[in-house]
């Protein structure tokens, strides 16, 4: 037969064969979280959840031993100082490269201002409300600052999630603001909300400054500088503005140690996350701190949680779900060789 002749069995050069199908990949090779998704997950699990314990534990230490906010800030800053050993082992300068040292100090100063305002607010305002105001203001300010200074826009889903977080903030804090007591108590409560708001603004600006720092040991350097700046500022202020108090019982010491460790973990995770994802989205995901703080406020501090608090926390969780689902993308790791 003609088809059996070698001439007819040769491939037709005028009609090239279709390209071969790409090799099949395992499920863990086909799909992996993007950088933005990884950053948001780290912010959610490592930044927001541990930070939710900090406010209630700080309030417990204050109720048990009347521990002032500046002293609690000093104890927390002490947990940052051992990072100097890591920098020395790596051969990195403790204060960062000389050309960006001033920005690193400014970032550390903003972090300390944010933390100090948060610790002061949680002593006069319920822990959940203080966390809500701080995270809500940081979310809004991060979105505005990043849009104006970095020209980094957000998608429609991201804006929907941000607006949802703000709505949750209004639902939680709104009823409390309308029922402020007259006199000294009402003034202190209003000042507590103002401190929480200013703490959120300082946090958003600090995250933006941190994103502008580009050197290998950026995170440990800023963490060490935050502890150093916090000690230099809060130790003199403690003796001038407040009265030093030594924790008197095991509960107070346990709260102080837990606050220092959990706050350092949250600080590290947020610093990593903000280099991977939009600062406004990171701040929005950190609203998980509000949910944890409200739960601990009810079960540990035995403080009343209003229905509006539960509703606002639900709205915030739904907004976090929208942002996370929007950024939950997959990247193919295998490339077909041509």
Curated annotation (Swiss-Prot):
What membrane topology was assigned to this protein in its record?
Multi-pass membrane protein
Q: Which SUPFAM superfamilies match?
A: Multidrug resistance efflux transporter EmrE
GO terms for cellular component: membrane
Cite the entry's keywords alphabetically: Membrane, Repeat, Transmembrane, Transmembrane helix
Q: Which residues form the signal peptide?
A: none
Give the stretches traversing the membrane.
Answer: 37-57, 67-87, 105-125, 160-180, 190-210, 221-241, 250-270, 281-301, 305-325
Tell me if Transmembrane is a UniProt keyword of this record: yes
Classification via InterPro entries: EamA_dom
Domain EamA, first and last residues per copy: 49-174, 272-325
Q: What are the subcellular locations of this protein?
A: Membrane
Residue ranges of the region described as Disordered? 1-24
Q: Which residues form a coiled coil?
A: none
Primary localization: membrane
Name the Pfam families for this protein.
EamA (PF00892)
Remarks, miscellaneous = The gene encoding this protein appears to have arisen by SVA-mediated retrotransposition of the SLC35G6 gene in the primate lineage.
Member of which family? Belongs to the SLC35G solute transporter family.
> Could you tell me what this protein is called?
Solute carrier family 35 member G3
Q: Which organism is it from?
A: Pan paniscus (Pygmy chimpanzee)
């Amino acid at each position: 037969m003609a088809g059996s002749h070698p001439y007819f069995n040769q491939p037709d050069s005028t009609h090239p064969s279709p390209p071969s199908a790409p090799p099949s990949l395992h499920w863990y090779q086909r799909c992996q979280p993007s950088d933005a998704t990884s950053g948001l997950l780290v912010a959610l699990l490592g930044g927001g959840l541990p930070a939710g314990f900090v406010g209630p534990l700080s309030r417990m230490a204050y109720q048990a031993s009347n521990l002032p906010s500046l002293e609690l800030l000093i104890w927390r800053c002490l947990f940052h100082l051992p990072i100097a050993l890591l920098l020395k082992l790596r051969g990195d300068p403790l204060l960062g490269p000389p050309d960006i040292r001033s920005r690193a100090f400014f970032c550390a100063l903003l972090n300390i201002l944010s933390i100090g305002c948060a610790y002061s607010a949680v002593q006069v305002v319920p822990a959940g409300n203080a966390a809500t105001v701080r995270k809500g203001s940081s979310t809004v300010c991060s979105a505005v600052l990043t849009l104006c200074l970095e020209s980094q826009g957000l998608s429609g889903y991201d804006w929907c999630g941000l607006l949802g977080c703000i709505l949750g903030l209004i639902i939680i804090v709104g009823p409390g603001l309308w029922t402020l007591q007259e006199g000294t108590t009402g003034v202190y409560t209003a000042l507590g909300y103002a401190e929480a708001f200013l703490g959120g603004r300082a946090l958003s600006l600090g995250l933006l400054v941190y994103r502008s720092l580009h050197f290998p040991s950026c995170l440990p350097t800023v963490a060490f500088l935050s502890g150093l700046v916090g000690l230099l500022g809060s130790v003199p202020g403690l003796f001038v503005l407040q009265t030093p108090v030594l924790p008197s019982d095991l509960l107070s010491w346990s709260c102080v140690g837990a606050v220092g460790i959990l706050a350092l973990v949250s600080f590290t995770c947020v610093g990593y996350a903000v280099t991977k994802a939009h600062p406004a989205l990171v701040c929005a995901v950190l609203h998980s701190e509000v949910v944890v703080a409200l739960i601990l406020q009810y079960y540990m501090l035995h403080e009343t949680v209003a229905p509006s608090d539960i509703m606002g926390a639900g709205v915030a969780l739904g907004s976090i779900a929208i942002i996370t689902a929007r950024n939950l993308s997959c990247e193919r790791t295998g490339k077909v060789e041509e």
